[in-house]
Each structure stands twice: as C-alpha cells, then as structure tokens.
C-alpha cells in the first residue's frame, strides 16, 4: 500500500471497498486507480499485458491480472471501464450478471471530484500540458493538489498524485463525451477542433453544444476559462451562462501575452491582466501553443489567489510532460549531433503547432520527422490537413497508420499519404512498412544539427528510446546527462 494514506472523504463510497479496473494500464485509468489506492481502497485491475504502469500499481498494492477473465471481477464491489470496453468483455458480463455496478472512468473521476474543489481542463488540444502546468503552479503556491493527468508529469514521476488540499485538477475527456459526468468548480476550454467525430455523429454543431453543456455543469458561482484566440471557443462564448474569463494573444482577452520570445526550449513572455501589474514569465517549452496553455494556468492561479511569485516559479520550474515535445537526448552523426525529440501529437493542428515551435526555437536547423498517423478514420477525415502540415518537414518518414482497433479504410493509409504529399512537390516522403527497423533507415538521412522528431499517438512512442539505445548510434547521450 502507498505510504501516507489519506482518509477517505467520500461518504457515499463507504460501502465500496473493492474497486476493479478493466484495462487498468490505460493512461486514463491508471491515475484514478493510483489515487484510489492512496485513499485506502482495495484496487484490482486487468490488462492484456504487463507494463511499467501495471508494475507501478502492483508495487502500491493493486492486484493485477494479465488477461480478461470472468473470475477477475468476482469479488469487486464496482467495475470501472473505459469507453473502449464493451459488454462482451467477460469481466463486464460477469459484473452485469451479478448486478455489480459498472461505471465509466469519468464517473469514478467525478466521484473523486464531488467533495473537492474541482478544476477540469477540456479541449481538443493542450489538455495534458495545461493540467500539468496547473499542478506545478498550485504546488509552487503551497496548495498540494490532487491531480489526474493523461501523461507522465516528469517532476512527479507519475500521472496522478493524491494531495492534502481540497483541490483536484484533472483532464476532461471529450473523445467519448464522458466529460459531461464531471461537475467542477472551474473549467478550461483550450480549443475545439474536429476530432473523435464518430462520438458526435459527424456533427460539428453537436460537438460545440456538448462543450457548452459541459461548461453548464459548473455551478452558477463557478468559472469558465476560455481561449479567445480559438475561433470555435469564441463562437460558443455568448452561449455560456456562467462567469467567464478569457485568455489569448487577442487584445480583447482578459489575460493576454505580449512580447513573446523563444530561445530553444525556453519561451519568454509578458502577461497582461486587468487591474494587475504586467508579469514577466518563462516556461521550459517551445511554441505559442504552450504560451496559451500557460495563460490558462495563470487565469486560474490568479483567480485562486496564488501569488505572482509562485506563478513565476511554477512555470519556470516546470519540467514537462512525457511525450509532449520530450527531448530524449543527442544522437551522434558525422560532424556533430542530432537532437532527438518525441511527441504525442496526432492531429494536424498539433503537428502544425510543433513544427512551428521547432521553426521558432531552432530556425537554422533541419527538421527530420518520423510520423505515425493514428487511426484510419482520423486519417480519412483530416486527410487534406495532414497532407498540408506534414509537407512542411524537411525530411519525412511516414510509418503505417496505427489502427487503434480499427479496420483499414481504402485511401486512408500512409502509402496514399506519401503519394499525395509527393504530388505537392515540396519533399519526397519515405513510406515505412510496419515492423521495419528504423535506425538503419534514419541514420543516413541525418546531418549534424538536425532535429529528429518522432511523433504520433501509437506505438511510435517506443521509437525514441530505441534509437537512443541503438548500436548504430553508439555514444548517444540521454537528456540530462550532458545532451546539448
């Protein structure tokens, strides 16, 4: 069991002692499981394979099952499931047969939030980074929040932590509309873009309305923090019948950034807030998109009474999030080194933001990009946008689409993407079949001073550490151990 257990504050959950997670290794599940372990609940969970995540939970006292079997859930008081799990799962089927409650992941998160000062971060892009920045700034302000994040907060070494204060900071997931379960006191909407459209029957208006409904889960005394630079957020703003504060680069925003300057991994800017002195801040992340994420954090921190000194400290001391422009280290090539970066971006808007950040922070360097599209349906729906943004790399290697459980869709694969990008005449992309060792393919393409970006939400996440440890890159230096 985790040390420093906190007493359980959820009166309605006193009868619940044994909580079972189906798919406990998932990024949205493991954090909630860890918080519940810290609260003193008996936690078990199943997954298809062991991982560092399941091993960590097991070390904290969770009972982990590899594989899904009916008997795994036999003694549970409640089952927690993600949207990827359906009633054909034997554990879910057993629970339903025995009248054991089966609740969505977001409903369990909402239960944790019920008796706390909830801060929920929603939006198509930037949720994980903004949530992580909030956790960092709140900690710098001495508030010790509980947080549940969709990525590993590097400073904490985890994506979830039970704090001692009344604050709970969490991501609000719109992909399956489950964020409608949450009832926070403060909510952020970073942006609204076309993604996960199957959830919304392909109707963008339905997606927009769902975000408005989410904000109306706030109490009448709550606060909606909204990015005025995003055209769709700006469009729904008049429909929101809750107190609001806006942020962005726009002169109309309540909290805005000026004098933005990027220097490699660091971004410097000045924050203007109504009736406050200008505040000079820096954050250890490149790109204007991370300035916006920082502004959302500053809005909430200011509203909660966190001092400017703590805001500056929390932002400048932020150590980043796993797979969000994560610098792995330096790869040796003839004449020098190549900076190796890993990133989770899997939507054209995210890809474009990262490319822009690279151009802004390292304008003299070439960008060599290994990209893996995520889902055939997303590739089909956003095909032209992918063609446009991926063509902006200097060198592009396209891995085959990571299916994420989907069947192939004709014309929505990486081979076709390569063809369409090639027709633009900007560069000649290289198609990579699944299972190919990339190190021998990548090395001849690299020059000293290049930035090698591995990007996507699928199993490409394992590529950067493989390259760092490849014999072809003997002498590679991991980040934090002398990397340039």
Swiss-Prot record:
Enzymatic reactions: UDP-N-acetyl-alpha-D-muramate + L-alanine + ATP = UDP-N-acetyl-alpha-D-muramoyl-L-alanine + ADP + phosphate + H(+)
Its EC number(s): 6.3.2.8
Keyword flag Membrane: no
Pfam families in alphabetical order: Mur_ligase (PF01225), Mur_ligase_C (PF02875), Mur_ligase_M (PF08245)
Pathway assigned in UniProt: Cell wall biogenesis; peptidoglycan biosynthesis
Primary localization: cytoplasm
A GO MF term: ATP binding
Keywords assigned: ATP-binding, Cell cycle, Cell division, Cell shape, Cell wall biogenesis/degradation, Cytoplasm, Ligase, Nucleotide-binding, Peptidoglycan synthesis
InterPro entries, alphabetized: Mur-like_cat_sf, Mur_ligase_C, Mur_ligase_C_dom_sf, Mur_ligase_cen, Mur_ligase_N, MurCDEF_pg_biosynth, UDP-N-AcMur_Ala_ligase_MurC
GO BP term (any one): peptidoglycan biosynthetic process
Membrane-crossing segments per the record: none
GO cellular component: cytoplasm
UniProt cross-references to PANTHER family, sorted A to Z: UDP-N-ACETYLMURAMATE--L-ALANINE LIGASE, UDP-N-ACETYLMURAMATE--L-ALANINE LIGASE-RELATED
Family, as annotated: Belongs to the MurCDEF family.
Function: Cell wall formation.
Protein name: UDP-N-acetylmuramate--L-alanine ligase
Source organism of this protein record: Pseudomonas fluorescens (strain ATCC BAA-477 / NRRL B-23932 / Pf-5)
Higher taxonomy: Bacteria, Pseudomonadati, Pseudomonadota, Gammaproteobacteria, Pseudomonadales
């Amino acid at each position: 069991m985790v040390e420093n257990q906190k007493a359980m504050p959820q009166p309605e959950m006193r009868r619940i002692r044994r909580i079972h997670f189906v798919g406990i290794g998932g990024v949205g599940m493991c954090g909630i499981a860890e918080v519940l372990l810290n609260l003193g609940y008996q936690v078990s969970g199943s997954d298809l394979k062991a991982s560092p995540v399941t091993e960590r939970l097991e070390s904290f006292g969770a009972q982990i099952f590899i594989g899904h079997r009916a008997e795994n859930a036999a003694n549970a008081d409640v089952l927690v499931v993600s949207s990827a799990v359906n009633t054909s799962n034997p554990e879910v089927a057993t629970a339903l047969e025995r009248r054991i409650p089966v609740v969505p992941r977001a409903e369990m998160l909402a239960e944790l939030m019920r008796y706390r000062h909830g801060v929920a971060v929603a939006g198509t892009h930037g949720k994980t980074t903004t949530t992580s920045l909030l956790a960092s700034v709140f900690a710098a302000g001495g508030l010790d929040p509980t947080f549940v994040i969709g990525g590993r907060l590097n400073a904490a070494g985890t994506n979830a932590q039970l704090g001692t204060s009344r604050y709970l900071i969490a991501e609000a997931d719109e992909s399956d509309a489950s964020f409608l379960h949450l009832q926070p006191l403060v909510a952020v909407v970073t942006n609204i873009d076309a993604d996960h459209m199957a959830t919304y029957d392909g109707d963008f208006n339905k997606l927009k309305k769902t975000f408005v409904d989410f904000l109306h889960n706030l109490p009448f005394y709550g606060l909606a923090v909204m990015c005025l630079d995003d055209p769709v957020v700006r469009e729904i703003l008049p429909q929101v019948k809750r107190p609001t504060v806006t942020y962005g680069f726009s002169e109309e925003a309540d909290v805005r950034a000026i004098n933005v300057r990027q220097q490699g991994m660091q971004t410097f800017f000045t924050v203007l807030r109504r009736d406050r002195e200008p505040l000079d801040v820096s954050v250890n992340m490149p790109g204007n998109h991370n300035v916006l994420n920082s502004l959302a954090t500053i809005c909430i921190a200011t509203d909660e009474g966190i001092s400017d000194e703590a805001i500056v400290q929390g932002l400048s001391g932020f150590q980043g999030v796993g797979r969000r422009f994560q610098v792995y280290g330096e790869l040796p090539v003839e004449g020098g080194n190549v900076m190796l970066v890993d990133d989770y971006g899997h939507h054209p808007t995210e890809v474009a933001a990262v490319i822009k950040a690279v151009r802004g922070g390292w304008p003299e360097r070439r960008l060599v990009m290994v990209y893996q599209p995520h889902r055939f349906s997303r590739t089909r729906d956003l095909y032209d946008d992918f063609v446009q943004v991926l063509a902006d790399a200097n060198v592009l290697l396209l891995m085959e689409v990571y299916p994420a459980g989907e069947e192939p869709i004709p014309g929505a694969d990486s081979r076709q993407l390569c063809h369409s990008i090639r027709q633009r005449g900007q560069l000649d992309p290289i198609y990579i079949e699944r299972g190919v060792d990339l190190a021998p393919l990548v090395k001849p393409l690299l020059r000293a001073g290049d930035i090698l970006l591995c990007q996507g939400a699928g199993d490409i996440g394992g590529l950067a550490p493989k390259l760092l440890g490849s014999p072809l890159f003997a002498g590679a230096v991991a980040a934090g151990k002398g990397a340039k």
